[in-house]
Amino acid sequence: MIYRVKFNKGIKNIVIFLMPLFLFTYNVNAIEKLTAHGGPVKGLAISKNNEYMASASFDYSIVVWKLNPIEENNTLIGHEAAVNTVQFSPTESLLVSGGDDNKLLLWPLKYPLKKDKEIEPYILGEHRGKVVDLDFSKNGKYILSASWDGSIGIWDIKKRKNIKFLKGHRGPVYSVKYSKDNKYIYSSGYDGEIKLWDAINGEYIRPLVKNGWGVSVFEVNEKENFIAYGSTDGLIKVTKINEDKIILKIGEDRTPILSMYYLENENMISFGNAKGRMIILDTTNWSLIRDFNAVNGPIWDNILFPKDSSLIVAGLDDFLTRWEIFDFPPEILERPGPTRRFNPLKDVSNGEKQFARKCSVCHTLIANGKKRAGPTLYKIFGRKAGTLNGYKYSKALLKSDIIWDEHTINE
């Protein structure tokens, strides 16, 4: 059964804001969970030939997945901090990634990718703040990067160097894109603006959107004359590019929109928010296709797959969740239960609770701490803090005299 809602002019906004009252009672069954990371998954990308997918994680790694069927193919290690974003080049010969270490790494790809083969990255360059979004020019010659240092980087792939940093946003830049003809650059940020830039000379042209809250994600379709975007106040808006006209306004008050995916050929666009809600829209008439709870916690990224009508979401879990887009369950289900990691079901000590909520994102309790950002906590009692080799520790921790025991962990 497919829920497709159409709205009459003039009442669209009123009706849409009432949707959570009845649509949130529908929670569909996940098709499968895909596990390869050791921490939350922040970014997703799919190759142009639809044969591979990449996921970026807090565990400092990127996993390349083979599709049809979906299986882990390669784990890429090179970043020195959480990886936030990843993109395949139009030519499919490169993968670019950006992370909390402020760096952009280029990964050369040779198809078909040999399973478990190690790939050495090249350092393309770095920002002064973490890198949160990337985009290739349509000809595959240049890369755009969005950073929390407030700038947009333009990078020459062949020369492997920065051409220019564009500055104009007040605060972090959240998202960046090339126009289809490579003549323009679009960017959005904390300041609530979607800006238009000249891609040739880097000159700022004008704001396309002035929003009261930060614009987390956006898509521009020049041919159909619309800009769709999600903001930190929880609203999804669709406006005309050259007119001050709102086509659609939908959302959940004060729950930030964190991710977005535009499947242009299928006229579908999807949004994920900070509470695990997925909203999928038909861009031909801006009717609702799906609105449901996909995960507990933020949806940092999502991808729509046209071939099998499925959706993959990434969030706080160390696995990806794959859903069927169109099939609802035969009966109304309860909301998903507490997540296994962040909400312990039984009464536990404060130390156990803190590990369940926070520490297990980066640490394990087993000897092999592979694919975790931090050191293993195996046999931690009696160990002095900051003494395990192979990890970077803060000066404060190195100077501390903390010995891990039941008391220090519980406190």
Indicate where each model-derived feature is located.
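Hydrophobic beta-strand positions that form the internal "hydrophobic ladder"
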Residues: M53, L95, I143, I185, ...
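Extracytoplasmic electron-transfer domains, predominantly the class I c-type cytochrome c fold
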Residues: K371, P375-E411
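WD40/WD-repeat beta-propeller blade N-cap
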Residues: L34-V41, L76-V83, L124-V131, K167-V173, ...
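Sequence/structural segment immediately N-terminal to covalent heme-attachment motifs in c-type
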Residues: L345-I366, L377
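Electrostatic cytochrome c docking/interface patches
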Residues: D327-Q354, K370
